[in-house]
Regions:
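Alpha-helical segment proximal to the catalytic Tyr-Lys
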Residues: 38-42
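Conserved catalytic-site region of short-chain dehydrogenase/reductase
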Residues: 12-14, 113
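Short, flexible catalytic-loop segment of classical short-chain dehydrogenase/reductase
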Residues: 51-62
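Cytosolic ligand/metal-binding cores
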Residues: 20
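Active-site helix of classical SDR
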Residues: 25, 33
């Protein structure tokens, strides 16, 4: 079985000021997910996208603690950064769930980014 899993970002939905190009590219990934799933369905290929929020990556973890705390304060629940293992768990679920196709799933603790 073949499954394509793209990575977008919540910036596709909540782009901040100064992120025009980044938000547009991530929006493009979201926008191509359903048509791609439809186009590839005839050959048995599924396509989904994950739009992660603020994840505990090496780049973010290298930021000052005050910056990290400020970011976490805007995440409703759970009030923490997302873990890479949680991203991996969602990938596994998308691969194993054969009825999940053409979808974009936000993995973001219900955060909505502010304009700045």
């Amino acid at each position: 079985r073949v499954v394509i899993i793209n990575t977008a970002s919540i910036a596709a939905f909540d782009g901040q000021m100064g992120q025009v190009a980044y938000s547009a590219t991530k929006g493009g990934i979201v926008g191509m997910t359903l048509p791609m799933a439809r186009d590839l369905s005839s050959v048995g290929i599924r396509c989904n996208t994950i739009a992660p929020g603020v994840m505990a990556t090496p780049l973010l973890l290298s930021a000052p603690q005050q910056v990290q705390d400020g970011i976490v304060s805007g995440i409703p629940f759970p009030k923490r950064l997302g873990e890479p293992s949680e991203f991996g768990q969602l990938v596994v679920h998308m691969v194993e769930n054969s009825y999940l196709n053409g979808e974009t799933v936000r993995l973001d603790g219900a955060v909505r980014m502010q304009p700045r």
